Amino acid sequence: YMRLRNIRGSKETIAASDYVVQEPETHKGTWGQLFGNEQPVQIEVGMGKGRFIMDMARLHPDRNFVGIEMYDSVLLRAVQKREQLEEDLPNLYFIRMDARNLPDVFEKGEVDKIYLNFSDPWPKKRHLTSRQFLERYDKILAPEGTVEFKTDNRPLFEFSLEEVKEAGWVLDASTFDLHHDAKLMEGNVMTEYEEKFSRAGNPIHKMIIHR
């Protein structure tokens, strides 16, 4: 897991960045205005250094993306990485926030898709795929909205499959070995971790679910 060093000045850099939405609650229900269009909004919870969501924003200019990260020191890396990009990516913003507050930031139906990539295996109640979190996602997802979850952690994946069932969500697709699943690999965008793990020969698990 990433060691979280408290980088000096990270708070100030984040507060001064045009890429970071400083008071996200004020945009609840009006994200289209911030982006300047009504394209579908997709979010990544726990985006780490931001490679996945920056690649997604570049590949899909017809969608709007919001990358959510809880830690200043990690978000700082994403901001720095983004500053070095040649292109502008007007369809991408970052937020520093705790994912437990998602329903304060997005209106019911405002989010089209939620990406969870290699989430930290917290104590069970705090897993991003626990029933408590699925309830939060349900409060912001569009009627046809989906959650996509990738991890290399098999116990976490199996726990998540159980939670999905218990919470009454529908499993659209799942695999224990994403990189050998032609259908689910279509258009797959890798995260930093994913590249490292799969290069080491570790299978990546993935599920797509909806309410």
PLM ranges: what are they?
Residues 1-41, 51-58, 80-109:
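S-adenosyl-L-methionine
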Residues 76-81, 159:
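Short alpha-helix adjacent to the SAM-binding motif of class I
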Residues 45-49:
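Class I SAM-dependent methyltransferase "Motif I" SAM/SAH-binding loop
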Residues 162, 166-211:
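Class I S-adenosyl-L-methionine
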Residues 71:
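Conserved SAM/SAH-binding beta-strand->alpha-helix loop
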Residues 129-143:
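A short glycine-rich, Lys/Arg-flanked "PGG" loop and its adjoining helix->strand segment in the class I
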Residues 144-151:
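Conserved beta-strand signature within the Rossmann-like core of class I S-adenosyl-L-methionine
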